[in-house]
Amino acid sequence: MVEVPSFRSNEHFPQLCDKVTVKWDKKRGRFVEAIEDIPIGTVVCVETGITVNVDPQNCYRCLKITENASFAYCKNCEEFYEPDEIACGEFDELGIFKLAAHLVFSYPFADIASLVQSSDPEPPSCAPKALSTQDIEAIFQLTPFPEIGEAFKAPAIQNAIKRIVESLETDENWGRLDQISRTMTFTKALRIMAERSAKNAHTIYSIEQIESQEDNLPMATGLFPISSIFNHSCTPNISGFFVRNTFIFVSQGVRAREELLDSYGVTYHQHTFEQRTNFLASVSGFICHCESCFKMKSLKVLEKPKKYPETIATNASCFTDITSYTENIPRGSKELENLIIAFARRPDSETYTELIFQFWKKFVENAKFRGITYDPYLVRPYVEMTILAWNKEVGCENEEKMSLLIVTHRLLRNCYVDLHPLSELVVKLVNVVANQNADEINRTLEKLKLRARMLWKYSEQSEDL
């Protein structure tokens, strides 16, 4: 489990912080409510989920990078029992059923066996008094998606069930059941887990993958039953990120008696109403009725993107082409930010140190005009400006340098609890700047620049402007 020293656990809901409680009503079902004001940067949830790898270089169970990619588990997880066929990826093509099978083996056999003798668990109709990820009841309280039951008729699923049940014959618990009972028990347990995973499971990307903005293979999929209590809003007041198999949420500023609301992948300030509606319907299976969708719909500057900024940035023959194009982009349009990111990936952009510094300033001003004032989205431009601020060609005054560094440090601390890949170096830079050690400042800046370039996948192919 990832350690978060600042986290203060709730007595009744150990994965949630002590500033919240869980409630229920007919409209929202279960929801998380603040019992007092929760300042920006406060950790509100730390949940180690039940996960299975997608990328084979990650441990099947905890998602650490394995020393040997041909072995499914890391050293700490190799004692975990589960049929080897699942852990070694033989059922990867079955998607959510791989996670569902893993869930069956993640809880005590007695809890799983009792499912055969009882009716299917019903979604809750009241607020729980206590709940933990370690309790199978946390899984049962998730809203099921019964339609997935049809998939059990597929030959591939039936064959997988048969193989797994046969492999359990020598298990000290499952082996006590005869073949028919073992098949019935496993099949029902698998179905219940699959129904609750279908619309509640998360696809897991690391911070590095999110920052690189590339279509990488996800690390894993997983179920986080406590985190799943957070409802969606297109204007959320919490934000979350993954560190291996741990889901961490931080407050973006929540008032007492307000509901804590997450974004399920789309927001009012970054996506049009149509984009949000289509995404939530296809991925999460619901229509959003938050205030942004019900009243405000879309920001006009997001409605009509012009061209592909990546193509413009790549094909520009001179810097004037870029600057003249930006002058025609409407204020607040995300197109400007995408153009700056695309242009910054060109190694030759560093030839224009002062101008690219001003570009990142425009990025922040443009995002703020759209309503993005304190958000993980602003980490990159502030890190880029901090690195450039100490460049002599930029000519920043000490006051501006310190201001940029402080904002960068606070963003990383308040949005990522200093668990961002660049956090350690930014903290070090704050310390060496305070000590006024010029040589150490330069060395730290070079390390920060190198790590940032690796994180944001700068192009290695240079084109002359």
From Swiss-Prot:
SMART domains listed in its UniProt record: SET
Pfam family, one: SET
Domain SET: 18-265
EC number: 2.1.1.-
InterPro entries per record: SET-MYND_domain_protein, SET_dom, SET_dom_sf, SMYD4_SET
EC supergroup of this enzyme: transferase
Swiss-Prot/TrEMBL GO biological process terms: methylation
UniProt keyword annotation of Disulfide bond present: no
Molecular function per GO: methyltransferase activity
Keywords: Methyltransferase, S-adenosyl-L-methionine, Transferase
Origin superkingdom: Eukaryota
TM spans (from-to): none
Annotated PANTHER family: SET AND MYND DOMAIN-CONTAINING PROTEIN 4 (PTHR46165), SET AND MYND DOMAIN-CONTAINING PROTEIN 4-LIKE PROTEIN (PTHR46165:SF6)
Family, per entry: Belongs to the class V-like SAM-binding methyltransferase superfamily.
Protein name (record): SET domain-containing protein 3
Organism from which the protein derives: Caenorhabditis elegans
Gene: set-3
